[in-house]
Regions:
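C-terminal helix-to-coil terminal segments
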Residues: 123-170
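Short, structured coil segments at secondary-structure junctions
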Residues: 25, 41, 133-135
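Gly/Ala-rich phosphate-binding loop of Rossmann-like dinucleotide-binding domains
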Residues: 19, 23, 107-108
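Rossmann-like adenosine-cofactor binding region
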Residues: 36-130
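Residues at the starts of beta-strands that form the adenosine-phosphate
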Residues: 5, 27-28
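Glycine-rich NAD(P)-binding loop of Rossmann-like domains
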Residues: 1-17
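Conserved acidic E/D residue at the C-terminus of a beta-strand in Rossmann-like folds
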Residues: 33
Length: 170
């Protein structure tokens, strides 16, 4: 992992946690966000609208963005085709962020790419879905959030959110 370049598409809390873990192993991280150009927990920041032009610079692309009308299909055929040789795409956010048909077609054409997918447009992934047949795809059943210490982190976030809500109501 040391020395690789990682694009994290979605620079919110989840994206920052992903970046922190990659940075711990010596990776260089770039956060892509639609709202800001400020570095927050990343080595670099970029606007999401520039993703297609610079996605070819990254060894790994991790999708952590929220699904909004403006982000639906964000990872398009053009973005996928622009990924560098032997790149890895990871989606732990929402299936609708990736154009599912385009992803299947590109992964069928480009055996050098690899996708690790925890989420899909329609879940669970049906037994006849063609993604199951691709050797360059790993599928998990929407459980990437399961990890040691996750409950503690979730309760800390809930506590902080409740505290903020109460303080704003005073």
């Amino acid at each position: 992992v040391a020395g690789i370049k990682v694009a994290v598409v979605g620079a919110g809390n989840v994206g920052q946690e992903v970046a922190k873990r990659f940075q711990a192993f010596g990776a260089e991280t770039t956060g892509f966000d639609i709202h800001t150009n400020e570095t927050v927990g990343f080595d670099h920041m970029a606007l999401t609208e520039t993703l297609r032009e610079c996605v070819g610079e990254f060894d790994v692309v991790v999708v952590t963005a929220p699904l909004l009308p403006s982000t639906r299909g964000l990872i398009s055929r053009e973005v996928l085709m622009a990924m560098q040789q032997d790149a890895v795409l990871v989606n732990i956010a929402r299936g609708g962020l990736i154009d599912q048909q385009a992803m299947y077609e590109v992964l069928s054409e480009r055996k050098d790419l690899f996708a690790a997918l925890d989420v899909f447009e329609n879940e669970p992934l049906t037994a006849d879905n063609p993604l199951w047949k691709l050797e360059n795809v790993a599928v998990s059943p929407h459980n990437s959030f399961v990890s040691n210490g996750n409950n503690k982190r979730m309760f800390a976030v809930m506590y902080q959110n409740l505290k903020t809500l109460i303080e704003h109501q005073k």
